[in-house]
Regions:
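N-terminal secretory signal peptides
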Residues: 1-2
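N-terminal export signals
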Residues: 5-26
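Conserved catalytic cores of very large enzyme subunits
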Residues: 27-205, 229, 260-264, 268, ...
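Extended non-globular scaffold/tether segments
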Residues: 207-211
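Short amphipathic alpha-helical heptad-repeat segments
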Residues: 212-217
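Intrinsic disorder/low-complexity segments
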Residues: 231-258
Length: 792
């Protein structure tokens, strides 16, 4: 019998022994845009490592004998809430009980197929806590505690596309440097130092902390059970498939790998039950436990998994020196670690940091960085996404490795440490050490390591004032604006007003964050919150507590304003009223004019002086209403240049605009040009962004750049890509990311999706499989690829 056959049959026997991989089937269809695993068929009986890793967070792989399923948890949570209301207990106590109930009651498993545990709450879109903290509790608290004018104006603006706003609980990162040294027992001891018995604030945290330790105990117990089952499996199978011998030495040798994995997993959990991480594997396990307890059980996205190489290197080097691990084992653990989030397949991707600068000024990139990049490259996952910090000290090998991966569609963003430090010193009085420790979070937002609780609440639609001004002009008998300067001035006045109202509403709705959704884990992880009796997410970080308001459609607004100038005030082809009428019928009867405006080179992204200057004015107008103004959380407001998916959402709520865009179509995303209009090449695009003062958008200053494959070929292509990144950063840009395609390749992928199952494109701050995009989104990428210059 061959070794491979023995391995397959051993795994199959293990799976059969614990009966944990065969469950009721479910029919899957793509539910919506962020359903990224609809294509991945349910597996009735998982027998191999790769399938297990892929399906782990796409179906239930737990041992049902260990606890209850998600539907039962939902009922138990509802009963707990009802009991809490009936008794009049504090919501902080109730929320902690909800966390504890899940940690202590959900079914779990510890499989020999994986280096990390499994939990019943596998579907992030069907978490039992989700509806409670996202819908039920906000509705109850907001109706009771917010002024009527706030909710009325807030919801009205959301409906008509003026903005899109919500209470954000999706952006938190603990200070990993601190809690990694404490471990869970150390966090419990620190909590005890500040806790006041009988105070619901601290009593709730004690409940949650104890539940984390109980949850760890449950994993240990289940691991030992699985290890015992594996040891008891002493029969083997001969070439004919019959059970032939017991206690065979060959079976023992072949099973040693799986037994070793289980034993090391149990040992790691036991170490974490007693103290802080001691090995590189412990670090990964600690991050795993915190993340899934926070996001899947407590309802708070943990938006960074640390600067992985910075944190792992000292542990890995010590492990190798002591003979505790091998590079091969470490690589396998890393693969399994990355696949946890590859399996979850969060549409927005899960951020991981990499690189940076040491205290002595040398680079953080090292031998462990290379291993991590190798494993990431081999996995070829859309998520986790790597938010890489680069600087003049970044070594050539790292540039070449990462840029080669980027041109092959790996999920990488390049953040300039120098421009980010400049913005942080201006707005946060950050020191050099603060800047060195900046953590990359979310899509690609830099934050202080001890203040990474910035919310992204409001998204302002830059096109809506233009739409409304033209609609008003269409109804007006008298021309309301005599020249373009007066039209522009009114636009800027309205943009400033909308931004200010967005800020004022946000100020009110963030007063109740702690009442809506108390953060158990983030509070326990933050000493300042414990000392000051504040919620770790809502307002309890020693620094940070900031609020980002995001700009949507900057480039398209520039294009639309210039189109008004050309059509009405320069060429006088239509009156303002006439142009408004054309917009009201979605360009019907004026296709020739629409195409001319759509194809005009007078657009943001082509280094047109007038477009550049107008962009500067729009950014200044927006930023002046936000930057440095106090929020209600003890921090400040920040203007932000990225817009997540709101360029589509708000585009659907916005009528036709004079730049050639039709009603409902997407607008520009981040600081990038409108899809398909940047025809003058990469140099012109970088120069466009350099024209603006990047410090005006301290939240982030991102550029999505599409390049033709011919630009990126070979060693010359890598040098060209590096030059683009370095010039962008020297000009003050914060983050740049690449999509490298030809229109021909994308058209073929659209026609033959079966040939491109793993093709990824960059959407905004994340990668998405091409086959998960709608045809409309695909067409937009093809249009832009058609116009991308093949040189500089």
């Amino acid at each position: 019998m061959t070794r491979n056959r023995f391995l397959r049959e051993l795994i199959a026997a293990s799976a059969a022994a614990y009966g944990g991989c065969s469950f009721a089937d479910s029919v899957r269809r793509q539910k919506n845009y962020d359903d990224t695993t609809w294509w991945d068929a349910y597996v009735e009986n998982i027998m191999d490592v790769d399938t297990y890793l892929r399906r782990k967070f796409r179906q239930d792989v737990t041992d049902r004998a260990t606890g209850v399923d998600v539907e039962t948890l939902k009922k138990l949570l509802a009963e707990t809430i009802a009991a809490g209301k009936a008794s009049g207990e504090s919501w902080r106590i109730t929320k902690a009980k909800l966390f504890a109930l899940q940690a202590e009651k959900m079914s779990i498993d510890v499989s020999p197929l994986d280096w990390f545990p499994a939990i019943a709450i596998w579907d992030r879109d069907d978490r039992p806590i989700f509806k409670i903290t996202k819908i039920d509790r906000p509705r109850e608290v907001n109706a009771k505690m917010l002024p009527a004018w706030v909710t009325k104006e807030w919801y009205a603006g959301n409906r008509d596309g003026t903005w899109n706003m919500w209470q954000d609980f999706d952006h938190s990162v603990p200070d990993w440097r601190v809690i990694m040294k404490l471990g869970f027992p150390g966090m419990k001891a620190r909590l005890g130092k500040y806790a006041v018995k009988g105070d619901p604030f601290y009593d709730g945290l004690q409940i949650a902390m104890d539940a984390m330790l109980t949850g760890t105990d449950r994993f240990i117990e289940q691991g030992k059970k699985r290890l015992g089952e594996l040891d008891a499996r002493h029969e083997t199978i001969d070439e004919g498939g019959d059970i032939k011998t017991k206690d065979a030495s060959l079976v023992s040798r072949l099973s040693s790998h799986f037994r070793n994995r289980l034993a090391k997993e149990i040992a790691s959990l036991e170490r974490l039950r007693e103290g802080p991480p001691q090995t590189a594997y412990d670090v990964m396990m600690f991050v795993w436990l915190y993340f899934f307890w926070s996001e899947h059980l407590d309802g708070f996205q943990c938006r960074s998994l640390t600067e992985l190489d910075v944190f792992l290197t000292p542990y890995y080097d010590a492990d190798i020196a002591a003979g505790r691990t091998t590079e091969a084992e470490f690589r396998e653990q890393l693969k399994h670690f990355l696949w946890q989030w590859g399996s979850v397949a969060n549409y927005w991707n899960q951020p991981v940091g990499l690189g940076g600068t040491k205290k002595d000024g040398t680079t953080e990139f090292n031998h462990v960085s290379k291993i991590i990049l190798d494993v990431m490259d081999e996995c070829a996952l859309a998520t986790p996404k790597f938010l890489v910090k680069v600087a003049p000290n970044t070594p050539d090998w790292a540039w070449e490795k990462m840029l080669d991966m980027a041109r092959r569609h790996r999920s990488l963003s390049f953040t300039g440490e120098v421009p980010v430090a400049k913005a942080f010193k201006k707005w946060f009085n950050a020191t050099d050490d603060d800047c060195r420790k900046i953590v990359m979070t979310g899509c690609y937002e830099p934050q202080l390591h001890d203040g990474a609780n910035r919310t992204g609440v409001g998204h302002v639609n830059f096109l809506k004032p233009i739409e409304r001004m033209l609609a008003e002009a269409a109804r007006s008998v008298i021309a309301p604006y005599q020249d373009f300067d007066s039209f522009k001035a009114e636009y800027l006045r309205r943009l400033a007003h909308v931004t200010a109202r967005c800020r004022e509403i946000t100020f009110e709705i963030e007063k109740v964050l702690g009442e809506v959704n108390p953060a158990n884990l983030m509070t326990i992880a933050t000493e300042h919150a414990l000392r000051t009796r504040k919620d770790g997410f809502a307002d309890g970080c020693p620094r940070g507590n900031d609020t980002a308001i995001l700009a949507v459609g900057i480039a398209t607004a520039v294009d639309a304003l210039l189109a008004v100038k050309e059509i009405v005030f320069e060429r006088k082809e239509l009156s303002l009223s006439g142009l408004g009428a054309v917009m009201s019928v979605n360009w019907e009867g004026h296709e020739e004019l629409r195409l001319r405006m759509l194809r005009s080179r007078r657009k943001w992204g082509n280094n047109d002086p007038e477009a550049n200057a107008l962009g500067v004015e729009l950014i200044e107008c927006f930023a002046s209403q936000l930057n440095g103004r106090p929020n209600s959380r003890g921090g400040i407001f920040l203007a932000c240049g990225h817009c997540a998916r709101q360029y589509i959402v708000l585009g659907e709520k916005t009528g036709a605009t004079p730049d050639g865009r039709k009603a409902g179509e997407e607008m520009s995303k981040n600081l990038s040009p409108t899809m398909g209009v940047d025809t003058e090449g990469a140099t012109a695009l970088v120069a466009t962004l350099a024209a603006s003062d990047v410090a005006k958008l301290p939240g982030d200053y991102p550029l999505d750049m599409m390049l033709h494959p011919s630009v990126c070929q070979g060693e010359k292509g890598l040098k060209a890509m590096r030059s683009i990144v370095e010039v962008f950063h020297r000009n003050g840009g914060a983050v740049i990311q690449f999509t490298v395609f030809s229109a021909e390749e994308l058209r073929d992928a659209q026609k033959h999706p079966e040939k491109y199952e793993n093709l990824q494109v960059r959407v905004c701050g994340w990668n998405v499989r091409w086959n998960d995009l709608s045809k409309t989104e695909q067409d937009a990428y093809i249009l832009r690829a058609e116009n991308v210059m093949k040189g500089f």
